């Protein structure tokens, strides 16, 4: 299967540049994965498609304001840092621009000097291993100095950092938001629970690999970047009980979906677990635990488009995407949603 098989025409004006003012009023395309039938709704209508036996699995990761603008200690030259992955307490794998100024031993200053950094090693694909020096709590300093690491296709500034966080975000560590979850409000989640639907939370810290293009022609040759995940005993029990009682396990977002499929055994059972996953789901993959998926509209030729094609069938997905373009749905991180049922 070739990468070009997952291409589609997307006019640039359909790439959403701002989050919706009211999260749950984005549009919702409902796709029946068996018949390919499509319905057009508003996100809050998701309630009508959930039944008391169902379980929604949500990723409670929180996006770090991981983009830092600083200067080189010796020269004062402007530098941009993007924190990718925590290696140990104050050591991060980081993308640094311009890279040529970030050799081992180079030192940098951020803000008024309350945060300093030194390159202590080279990482994968041109990244740098950076050690940070500061007094106080790193997350608080990052909150003051850092900016949200918005995807490259969002050109406009984000006025409110919280609009790029889900209302249930808790565990800090992501370089990007699990965007399907951005559509939920606290009120909508409450209504969902009142209907008898269980909410179960897991964590997957989204890495920047999520925006990296597939650079091989044959999709089977593509290698995913690994991302940290964890699921506790309580969540595992809710999911296993749902399956046993004939309910659906509905993943909110591709990150929840990939975590569930990483942890599930052949029989679709899950357990308390943490680790790193580089699972790559594409057509031909047989889902073990996920029955349905709430997700946004993904980039042409992306691994996430391949993941949804594995769940609903490539023809159904490509047809739904062409309909979404025709009906002017908003695409990508701040865009509209799709429910694959």
Curated annotation (Swiss-Prot):
It is found in: Cytoplasm. It catalyses: 7-aminomethyl-7-carbaguanosine(34) in tRNA + S-adenosyl-L-methionine = epoxyqueuosine(34) in tRNA + adenine + L-methionine + 2 H(+). Its EC number is 2.4.99.17. GO terms for biological process: queuosine biosynthetic process; tRNA wobble guanine modification. One of its GO terms (cellular component) is cytoplasm. One of its GO terms (molecular function) is S-adenosylmethionine:tRNA ribosyltransferase-isomerase activity. InterPro entries: QueA, QueA_dom1, QueA_dom2, QueA_sf. Keywords: Cytoplasm, Queuosine biosynthesis, S-adenosyl-L-methionine, Transferase. SUPFAM superfamilies: QueA-like. The keyword GTP-binding does not apply. It is an enzyme of class 2 (transferase). Pathway: tRNA modification; tRNA-queuosine biosynthesis. Pfam families: Queuosine_synth. It comes from the Bacteria. Transfers and isomerizes the ribose moiety from AdoMet to the 7-aminomethyl group of 7-deazaguanine (preQ1-tRNA) to give epoxyqueuosine (oQ-tRNA). Belongs to the QueA family. Monomer. HAMAP family: QueA (MF_00113). PANTHER family: S-ADENOSYLMETHIONINE:TRNA RIBOSYLTRANSFERASE-ISOMERASE. This is S-adenosylmethionine:tRNA ribosyltransferase-isomerase. It comes from Clostridium botulinum (strain Okra / Type B1). The gene is queA.
């Amino acid at each position: 299967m070739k990468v070009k098989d997952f291409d589609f025409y997307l006019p640039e004006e359909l790439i959403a540049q701002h989050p919706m003012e009211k999260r749950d009023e984005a549009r919702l395309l409902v796709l029946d994965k068996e018949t390919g039938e499509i319905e057009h709704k508003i996100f809050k209508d998701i309630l009508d498609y959930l039944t008391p036996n169902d379980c929604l699995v949500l990723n409670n990761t929180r996006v770090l304001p991981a983009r830092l603008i600083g200067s080189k200690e010796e020269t004062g030259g402007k530098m941009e840092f993007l924190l990718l992955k925590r290696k140990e307490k104050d050591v991060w794998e980081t993308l640094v621009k311009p890279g040529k100024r970030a050799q081992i031993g180079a030192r940098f200053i951020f803000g008024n000097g309350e945060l300093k950094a030194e390159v202590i090693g080279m990482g994968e694909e041109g990244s740098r291993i950076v050690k940070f020096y500061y007094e106080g709590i790193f997350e608080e300093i990052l909150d003051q100095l850092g900016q949200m690491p918005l995807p490259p296709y969002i050109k406009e500034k984000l006025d409110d950092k919280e609009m790029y966080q889900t209302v249930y975000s808790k565990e800090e560590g992501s370089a990007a938001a699990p965007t399907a979850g951005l559509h939920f409000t606290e009120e909508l989640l409450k209504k969902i629970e009142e209907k008898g639907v269980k909410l179960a939370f897991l964590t997957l810290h989204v890495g920047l690999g999520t925006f990296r293009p597939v650079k091989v022609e044959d999709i089977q040759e593509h290698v995913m970047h690994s991302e940290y995940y964890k699921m506790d005993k309580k969540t595992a029990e809710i999911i296993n009980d749902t399956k046993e009682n004939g309910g659906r396990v509905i993943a909110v977002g591709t990150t929840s979906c990939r975590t569930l499929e990483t942890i599930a055994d052949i029989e679709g059972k899950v357990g308390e677990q943490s680790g790193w996953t580089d699972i790559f789901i594409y057509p031909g993959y047989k889902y073990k635990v996920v029955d349905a998926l709430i997700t946004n509209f993904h980039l042409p030729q992306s691994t996430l488009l391949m993941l949804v094609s594995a769940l609903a069938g490539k023809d159904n997905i490509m047809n739904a995407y062409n309909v979404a373009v025709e009906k002017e749905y908003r695409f990508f991180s701040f865009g509209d949603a799709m429910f694959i049922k």
